[in-house]
Amino acid sequence: MPGLQTSNLAAAVVVATKLNLTLDQDCIDEAFMALSIAGRQQQLVAMDRLWWLDVAHNCESVARLAVAIAEKSDGVETHAIFGTMADKPLRAMIELISEGISSWHLPAHEGIARAANPADLAQLIKRISPKVAVQCYPTPESAFNGIENVSKPGDRIVVFG
């Protein structure tokens, strides 16, 4: 079950075992195989591109996402649409995942006071990865439209933050 977090289900199984509840091993196996969490490395195909949607918004979840990207790189270009809150550990988050990203697309989030400014994120990304392409957009919708112009069929687009 690559790309999915199983720790919560595993914890539930441990608790049930400690409480001496009877669990059917086939049901446990089936639950692990069927486990999926919307927004956690969720994969969709649209516009002939593979889209990964992940709510990764802290260092731990960004690190897991970076590992998943590295494990499934297969020479595929990976473009990121990234937005986050300004009070997050921005440098650390970007450093964790930057090696796997070919281009960054940073939308503004109008009306969200805590949202990180895309221009500030762009400066930080350029300091960490000077050669990578970075584009700022006024809205998330414009970032989605813009990424279609720089990506090609078969590319991966990771939307996270």
Task: Give each language-model segment a name.
Residues 89, 154-161:
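Short, amphipathic C-terminal "tail helix"
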Residues 82-84, 109, 160-161:
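Glycine-rich beta-strand-to-loop/alpha-helix junction loops that act as flexible
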Residues 22, 72-76, 147-157:
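Glycine-rich phosphate-binding loop signature in dinucleotide/nucleotide-binding domains
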